């Protein structure tokens, strides 16, 4: 069963109402929930914490939750509304609760917790659509894509393979100073038809939709690594213009490797060979698996 998007979209955007509803065990679409020690419910949600390195205006409108697809603009077409506030640089979907466990209430210290819906109906449909597209069963992939469109759009509309292909073939490939939703698959782990083919365009559509629907859930890096997508670190000014491109994660950059847990490294297992780099501000970025825009 899919999420009741009408009921969810009617919930208050403030406090913990939407995040708590998102990870509710009563939701039949949530197949697996996971509670972890994490501050992401504050960093990636409606708190000033982490505001400098935020999911901000430029990436929101150029690449994901307010970007354009064959369906129109994501922030007006889809039932999942974008949270924004003129006092914060962040724009996001509200999904991850922030809970704090006090170990000493008087001292105000303890541990931050977050809860994630790590396996859902919508995620399953997106992954099956991708699997169909990779196996060459393009119409079956389109059918799954349209199943999501029927439940996720305010005014449901479905699309043919030709409509999807025509749209994405009409979009320029991403460059760091002219970002789009369409990325070069530089070194994918799969065998994919040439750029401009029906298969490649359909995969662009599926990855675009997944990036919108799963924003803030931690899955994007998997797509980045599997498809060999280059990521750039950019600076934006107060007018949301890209003022500088300061770094990149190329396909073979060792920083793309996920580091082993500290406890197993301490026990003697050799860590993955990652590197520390300096940004232009002179700050050390150690094990930077994700690179965010900096808003000055």
Model-found features: residue ranges?
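Glycine- and acidic/polar-rich repeat regions and solenoidal domains
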Residues: 37-49, 53, 63
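Acidic/polar-rich alpha-helix caps and helix-coil junctions
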Residues: 1-41, 69-296
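Aromatic (Trp/Tyr) and acidic
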Residues: 49, 55, 59, 65, ...
């Amino acid at each position: 069963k899919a999420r009741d998007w009408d009921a969810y979209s009617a919930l208050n955007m403030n406090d913990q109402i939407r995040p708590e509803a998102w990870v509710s065990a009563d939701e039949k679409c949530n197949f697996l929930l996971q509670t972890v020690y994490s501050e992401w419910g504050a960093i990636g949600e409606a708190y000033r914490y982490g505001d400098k390195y935020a999911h901000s205006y430029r990436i929101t409108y150029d690449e994901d939750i307010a970007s354009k697809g064959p369906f129109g603009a994501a922030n007006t077409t889809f039932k999942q509304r974008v949270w924004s506030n003129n006092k914060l640089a962040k724009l996001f979907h509200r999904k991850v609760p922030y809970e704090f466990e006090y170990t000493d209430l008087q001292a105000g210290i303890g541990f931050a917790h977050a809860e994630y819906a790590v396996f859902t109906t919508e995620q399953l449909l997106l992954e099956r659509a991708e699997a169909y597209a990779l196996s060459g069963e393009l119409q079956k992939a389109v059918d799954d894509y349209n199943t999501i469109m029927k439940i996720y759009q305010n005014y449901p509309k479905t699309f043919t393979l030709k409509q999807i292909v025509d749209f994405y073939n009409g979009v320029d490939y991403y460059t760091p100073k002219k970002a789009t939703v369409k990325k070069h698959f530089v070194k994918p782990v799969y065998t994919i038809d040439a750029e401009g083919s029906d298969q490649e365009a359909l995969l662009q559509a599926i990855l675009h939709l997944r990036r919108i629907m799963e924003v803030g859930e931690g899955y994007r890096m998997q797509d980045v690594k599997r498809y060999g997508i280059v990521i750039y670190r950019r600076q934006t000014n107060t007018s949301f213009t890209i003022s500088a491109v300061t770094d990149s994660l190329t396909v073979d950059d060792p920083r793309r490797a996920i580091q082993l847990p500290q406890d197993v490294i301490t026990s003697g297992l050799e860590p993955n060979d990652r590197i520390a780099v300096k940004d232009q501000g002179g700050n050390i970025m150690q094990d930077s698996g994700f690179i965010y825009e900096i808003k000055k």
